Amino acid sequence: MTTLTRQDLNFGQVVADVLSEFLEVAVHLILYVREVYPVGIFQKRKKYNVPVQMSCHPELNQYIQDTLHCVKPLLEKNDVEKVVVVILDKEHRPVEKFVFEITQPPLLSINSDSLLSHVEQLLRAFILKISVCDAVLDHNPPGCTFTVLVHTREAATRNMEKIQVIKDFPWILADEQDVHMHDPRLIPLKTMTSDILKMQLYVEERAHKNS
């Protein structure tokens, strides 16, 4: 067993790569399972050795890729606390939030040979849980859209400004009123703990979605 800092072997980049790929798959799957877009724009693929649904709509795919491309440098620096997929009704009020809480330890005690395969097994369990989450959630009203929120540590603000210039992709400070839900129902979906990453996924669901 070897103890490394996050700077050794550029391990922050490895974690960011793994998380970015996972979050891309997760966002596509959430949009499919929660029927935010017609099922016809999705195709079955295989990720983490399980079948998943991925969008084949170019503009939607580009938005998701651009978003996560800008999140990746923040993940690399361990500046991300949460990534939230918010599903909004026609009035742009949130009806559901899929919250990925992410914690990366400053010291990594790892066996590098088995590291990635172990993490991928844990991420597979998240994907399987998302695939069946509609069983514990109420139906959403028609005409929903979505957005992605990133909760960062305070020190990340300057990094985000730099990323905006480099990536030409505008981050906008979220208005708490726009994304707030009064007394939502909390549904825990999955938690993982590994040597390089701790992550928790839960859903906040609005009590009366059609009102």
Curated annotation (Swiss-Prot):
Its main location: nucleus. It is found in: Nucleus; Cytoplasm, Cytoskeleton, Spindle; Cytoplasm; Chromosome. The keyword Lipoprotein does not apply. Keywords: Cell cycle, Cell division, Chromosome, Cytoplasm, Cytoskeleton, DNA damage, DNA repair, Mitosis, Nucleus, Transcription, Transcription regulation. Transmembrane segments: none annotated. One of its GO terms (molecular function) is JUN kinase binding. One of its GO terms (biological process) is double-strand break repair. Residues 13-203 form the HORMA domain. Residues 21-155 are annotated as: Mediates interaction with REV1 and REV3L and homodimerization. Adapter protein able to interact with different proteins and involved in different biological processes. Mediates the interaction between the error-prone DNA polymerase zeta catalytic subunit REV3L and the inserter polymerase REV1, thereby mediating the second polymerase switching in translesion DNA synthesis. Translesion DNA synthesis releases the replication blockade of replicative polymerases, stalled in presence of DNA lesions. Component of the shieldin complex, which plays an important role in repair of DNA double-stranded breaks (DSBs). PANTHER family: MITOTIC SPINDLE ASSEMBLY CHECKPOINT PROTEIN MAD2, MITOTIC SPINDLE ASSEMBLY CHECKPOINT PROTEIN MAD2B. Homooligomer. Heterodimer with REV3L. This dimer forms the minimal DNA polymerase zeta complex (Pol-zeta2), with REV3L bearing DNA polymerase catalytic activity, although its activity is very low in this context. Component of the tetrameric Pol-zeta complex (Pol-zeta4), which consists of REV3L, MAD2L2, POLD2 and POLD3; Pol-zeta4 is the fully active form of DNA polymerase zeta. Component of the shieldin complex, consisting of SHLD1, SHLD2, SHLD3 and MAD2L2/REV7. This is Mitotic spindle assembly checkpoint protein MAD2B.
